[in-house]
Design a protein with these regions (language model features):
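Transmembrane helical cores of multi-pass secondary ion antiporters/exchangers
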Residues: 1-416
């Protein structure tokens, strides 16, 4: 299949699955599309079992494997999705919660990676470094999944800022940690030039701080240009160029593209909106990026649903995946509870913050993409299967119940 054919097929499936969800299931759009995609995949498997001569599963698996999921997400869609998400997080709100967000996106990721890594190594017998790679890719909360659920759940604004801000930044931090650990665990295929902790620390600083600096510089330059223009079509195009071009420039400069996209989006969404856009331009920019967000979300969740055909399903792998769900939840609880406990003597937190942020820390497509991007090894199929099980549980079960958890903890309306 050509790239255009794959894109057309994904858009058709996203529209069809979204329609089925809207008319019948009536679930939050992203979750509903994923559920329908999984159901369609199950129907294909059943049809293949009933009519094996048709070879339906093999045909579909071949088509799915042609989709470079990791490349499509990590080098294409992710920059746009993060930029769109960051546009709608106000700097003033984030400034009030910056220390919580910073600790959860750094200390929290480190704690979660260690807990999952040691636990997964103990459960499966996997070498510790390889298990830590799994810990790194499953620890970040996915901003795409989180933002999709936040649109449907009526949470306390301060709590929503914590969850959204953390998900935007820990994604970039988690990716850098994953990159470092892949270089240490798989040195032949890794991207680090050396296997020392010094090299790892240098890479982390280069990727994280370099990405933030690039995002702020590009965002500021774009802001200055937009101040001189009053043409909504051109200004929408400029923001698109910033998100797409800036991400690719970050890749070329070997700095973090995700962190670049978040920093640029935050600056344009706050300072740019206030001082460089007319009311008409604000309306069009906001509407354009909301549509980009919705469309790419729909396509991404279709891709997650059909990636089941790329997963090796055995009883041992499924058991490891189910145990990984509990492991990921324990790690997430620790990643939330420790920073909040450290900050409690200095500031207050609303009731149920730890519970809601633990259950609302959804995993998503980024974890699957990182698992698929691992170099081939004897442990990759197990890591991919465990990742897929955790992600599906997180999006479907946690995503559908986080509203009820929030209601019991803080009196907000239910999600559905």
């Amino acid at each position: 299949m050509t790239l255009l054919q794959i894109a057309a097929a994904l858009l058709v499936l996203a529209a069809a699955f979204g329609t089925v969800n809207y008319l019948f299931l009536k679930l939050p759009s992203t979750i509903g599309i994923l559920v329908v995609a999984l159901a369609a995949s199950l129907v294909i498997v059943i049809a293949d079992a009933v009519f094996p001569a048709l070879g339906i599963t093999d045909t579909v698996r071949g088509a799915v494997l042609e989709i470079e999921f990791s490349e499509a997400l990590l080098e294409g869609m992710l920059g746009l999705l993060l930029f769109a998400g960051a546009l709608h997080v106000k700097l003033g709100d984030l400034r009030r919660e910056w220390l919580v967000v910073l600790l959860m996106a750094t200390l929290g990721i480190g704690l979660s990676t260690a807990i999952v890594g040691f636990g997964f190594s103990w459960i499966t017998g996997m070498p510790l470094m390889a298990a830590l790679v799994f810990g790194a890719l499953i620890s970040p909360t996915d901003p795409v999944a989180v933002m999709g659920v936040l649109r449907s759940a009526d949470l306390d604004p301060a709590l929503e800022t914590k969850i959204a801000g953390e998900s935007l930044f820990n994604d970039g931090v988690g990716y850098v940690v994953w990159l470092i650990l892949v270089g240490l665990a798989f040195p032949v295929a890794g991207e680090t030039e050396g296997g020392t902790l010094g090299d790892a620390a240098t890479l982390f600083v280069q990727e994280a701080l370099g990405g933030a600096a690039l995002g702020l510089v590009l965002g500021f330059v774009t802001f200055r240009v937009m101040r001189r223009i009053d043409d909504y079509a051109l200004e929408v195009l400029i923001t698109l160029a910033l998100a797409f071009g800036g991400y690719e420039l970050a890749v070329l400069l070997h700095v973090s593209g995700p962190i670049m996209a978040v920093c640029a989006g935050l600056l344009i969404g706050d300072v740019g909106t206030k001082h460089a856009m007319s009311a008409e331009t604000q309306t069009y920019v906001d509407g354009f990026w909301r549509m980009i967000d919705e469309i790419l979300n729909a396509v991404l969740f279709v891709m997650i649903g059909v990636e089941v055909f790329a997963v090796t399903i055995t009883s041992d792998y499924l058991i490891a995946g189910v145990l990984s769900i509990a492991l990921a939840l324990v790690a997430r609880f620790t990643a939330v509870a420790v920073p909040i406990t450290l900050l409690k003597p200095f500031r207050g937190f609303s009731a149920g913050t730890i519970r809601i942020m633990t259950w609302g820390g959804l995993k998503g497509g980024i974890s699957v993409a990182l698992a698929l991007a691992l170099p081939d090894s004897e442990w990759k199929p197990l890591i991919l299967t465990a990742t897929y099980v955790v992600v599906i549980f997180s999006i479907v079960v946690q995503g559908l119940t986080v509203g009820r958890v929030a209601e019991r903890a803080g009196g907000t309306p239910p999600l559905i």
